Structures are given as C-alpha cells and as structure tokens.
Amino acid sequence: PEAVVDAAFRSVKKASELIDMRTHHGEHPRIGATDVLPLVPVSGVTLEECAEMARALAKRIADELAIPTYCYEAAALRPERRNLAVCRKGEYEALAQRITDPAEMPDFGGGEFTGQAARSGATVVGARDFLVAVNFNLNSTSTRRANAIAFDVREKGRPRREGNPITGRIVRDAEGNPVMIPGTLKGCKAIGWYIEEYGIAQVSMNITDIRATPLHVAFEEVCRQYLIRLRYAGQLP
C-alpha cells in the first residue's frame, strides 16, 4: 500500500506541473487538476486502513505541494464531507471564496487562495469501495430531460416543489434546507449533460454501492425512466 500512496502523491505533483486550472473548462464537475483521489481496498488491506492512509496523503499533498485538500467517503473528517459533491461544491470557480470560509475551507491547506491553489485547485482524497461509472446515451439532445431522469434515479433525488414539480417553489425544512424526494436507486449518483462530440445527451452515473444497486438493476431502472420520456439509444462504459 505504501508504494501505491507514494505513486499517487507523485501523480498529483506531476498534474500540478502540467495542468493550469485557470484556463480549464469542461462538462464534468471538477475542483482541481487532480480532482478526486480515492484509495480502494483491493487486497491485503482494509477500508479503515485505506482511510488512515488517505488522510495522511491529503496532509502530505497540502504540506509539500501547497495544494489544498478535502477528505471524503471513509476518510472524511466531517460527516457531511463523506459525499464528494459536498467537497466539490461550486467546483474550482468557488474555491477562492470557500478556502477562507471556516465552514467551507479544505481539511488541509485552507485559509489563503495562494498562487499554487489558483493554478492547481484543490484535490479531494478519500477511501471507498469499488465504484462503477457508466454513461447512458439518450436519443435526445435535451440536457433538461437527461437531468430529469438523473434526478429521478439518483439516491439523493430531487427537491420537493409546491404545485408544479418543475417550476414550483422549493419546499424547505425549518432550517431552510430543501426537502428532497428520494430517487429510486440506492448508492447511486447521477447527472445529465449534453456531449457535443456525440451529438447526444447522457445520464452519467456513479454506482458507489454495487451491492445495493448492481449494474443490471441500474440499467433496467434507467431504461424504465427513459421509456417514460424518451427512447434508449445505447450505453458507454
């Protein structure tokens, strides 16, 4: 495991030398040149051990490379940061503001938006089990429809609204947080987007718990949602 961790550190260092986030644009959510770095227990190591190594790696990246880091999933130092989307909130463009906010700043290397942070962004380091990433192609160019399907199937679901389910006012709890309608697939995250290269919209999904939702179950549920709105056209690994 130590060799893997060292190789991961050197990869982050090389990415920081080659990639300048100040000129980066793209479709996929990201917060830094090395966006997310999970350690996965393949053999001879436990998830808990991976989490300890991930925290140490996150601190090393911040200390030696001056790249701010968040810890997520099993390595999270705050419960809400188990979710990658919470660490990535606002993406790279929001990092300059978040890095000085005590409630939002990185776990390591926060407090100042340095020149290195501006160039490399932040890195989210963690430990998790195996993840399945799959993109479902739609016979459509509509990002709105792709997102609607993603919101219906992802575990987080969609905000509850008053009246019109699309344009109605979002219902909030006593603390001002949106009240969510859970999606149909446990352990799944999904978003919809348009892929200009292919000329189609996609639902991009990460299955973070393949025991709760095997790939074939996700496939069948996404197809069911497609049939409600659109026509399924294929998938990419």
Give residue spans per PLM region.
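Long, contiguous binding/interaction regions
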Residues: 1-237
